Amino acid sequence: MKKLLLGAAAAALLFATPARADITVCTWGTITGPDALVNGMTYGTADYLKYLNESKGGIAGEKIKVLMLDGRYKLDEELKIYRRCADQEQAVVINGWSTGASKALRDQIQQDGIPFISESFASEVLDPEKYPFTFIAGPTYEQQMIIALRDLAAKGGKNVVLMYSDNEYGRGPVNVVRDSGVIDKLGLKLVDLVEYRYDAQDVTAQMLRIKAKNPDLVYVQGSTPQLIVALRDAAKAGLPTKLFVGNMYNISPAIPEQLGAAAEGFRAIQTYSFFGDNIPAMKEIEEYAKKNEVEKKDIYFIKGWLKGKVIAAAIESAIKKAGGKVPADIKAFRKSVRDEMEALKDFDTGGITPPFTFKDHQGSVQARVAEIKDGKYAPVGTWINAR
């Protein structure tokens, strides 16, 4: 198992190469903490860049220095890590984590001029004109929610409950969808908004309240740990699992593993291929795994591998534009990487998503509904455009 080296900021440092740091990439996530069940995307990005170091000698003959850091899902820790990456480490690209940190940093990122890929799918950090250095890697939380609402409307359902955590990750997307009027436009009725503590270990009271509303759909804007609690207590309250739909961060093997039969029928929005699918990117992962341990074998690792591909492609293009050498001016290098990331067109993701163009800073917006059947997630619909 990879060893975590904890510094003064309680940050985990992995994969730092001894080579000169001409190309430094920082990626942070919840390596330890309440959201650790979905941290495969942090490992995936770091592992892809390590894969390039091992298989191709890095980028343009230069090894990539990769810092994988632990933000512990604490805003103050994430802000400290950002400053470390931007200033001391002179990172050319930063891959951040939470919605709260991404929103808190969104103006600073533009001032610093550092390409920043957020793990958050919040629409409030996605604006190529206002936030030209910020990117995400898939449909926004709001777009994912609307897919579930469209699916309900198409099936003749009516009553909707939106359940969400008491933080930026939970409230922000729910407020955007509620205020957009899309629920009414689809002929649906919002019968309740139910908030819960992000670290709650019991939501039975909320489930009894939801049961009294007799909904046709309960959309949960929460991460995997919260979904496990919600579905467990829904079963106690006599609410069918099939009523519940979650976002991309609810496609975790931990849900059926921990809940067993109580997870059957739960649905979530799928935005990437599954780990183990017969796609070219999986062949790369298998090659990497011959010499290295892959700790996170899930869809989040696949997302991370995709982000690694995007980061590497943008850096490689920037170096080519500079005559094949790493630019000495870090500000100019960062700006060029940002420009090349935005310029990615018909980008081949190795089957993780359809080829995409990154001009909108979002990449692929393809998504579909997946349902837990016999303990595993299985697609129950075709890929659709989330816009």
How would you label these PLM feature ranges?
Residues 15-21:
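Sec/Tat signal peptide C-region and signal peptidase I cleavage site
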Residues 4-10, 21-387:
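Extracytosolic ligand-binding ectodomains
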